[in-house]
Amino acid sequence: MEQYKKEFIEFMVDCGVLKFGDFTTKSGRKTPFFVNTGFYRTGAQLRKLGEYYAKAIHDAYGLDFDVLFGPAYKGIPLSVATAMSISEHFDKDIKYCSNRKEVKDHGDTGILLGSPISDGDKVVIIEDVTTAGTSIGETMPILSAQGNVDVVGLVVSVDRMERGQGKKSALKEIEENYGIETTAIVTMKEVVEHLYGKPYNGKVVIDDQLKQAIDAYYEQYGVEA
């Protein structure tokens, strides 16, 4: 596992984004872990988060693209922070763009925020955690309306590696339904691999009991890597 992935996993723990315990998802599943990206709340945290996204994008897709598109609302700061990080660490000036959920009737009435998207642009979509394809289903028509746009791929922070309504993961369903590549900074398999049985800040984050609960969850809801 790459070093930046290990650092990102620990970063999520430090920020309180990655939690372990007893949770219930929106779909009603009982889960022993939860990822809440709403806990990235400071400038320093967003700067680091942008760095991890930038490295994941560079590894998966390279930098031969024009625009980072972050769907409203959580994708807005992600697109900004990551575009800044790509400029700083890879010396590549990438445009950022997001959409409005509400239509304005005054001033700038366009649906897009940030850079416009032009015919022929190559776009990478950036999101937080994808557990269903709802957001991408709203995003693709917005991009298509801008012209002949080439969607290079989708990047999320964590791939939960669990089934949606069918037998495949949400990211795999997106790949098949929309014909685009997907990637994540880390997968939950990598999270467990890095944290299981190892002390971090004086505490073992994933002990044997929690590991058994995670294994049982994936026995019921998991997908193949």
From Swiss-Prot:
Q: What is the designated name of this protein?
A: Orotate phosphoribosyltransferase
Q: Which family does it belong to?
A: Belongs to the purine/pyrimidine phosphoribosyltransferase family. PyrE subfamily.
Species of provenance: Lachnoclostridium phytofermentans (strain ATCC 700394 / DSM 18823 / ISDg)
Gene name of this polypeptide: pyrE
What residues does 5-phospho-alpha-D-ribose 1-diphosphate bind to?
Answer: 26, 73-74, 100-101, 104, 106, 127-135
What is the catalytic activity of this protein? orotidine 5'-phosphate + diphosphate = orotate + 5-phospho-alpha-D-ribose 1-diphosphate
Source superkingdom? Bacteria
Q: Organism classification, top ranks?
A: Bacteria, Bacillati, Bacillota, Clostridia, Lachnospirales
State the coiled-coil residue ranges. Answer: none
Kindly list the GO CC terms recorded for this protein.
cytoplasm
Names of the cofactor(s): Mg(2+)
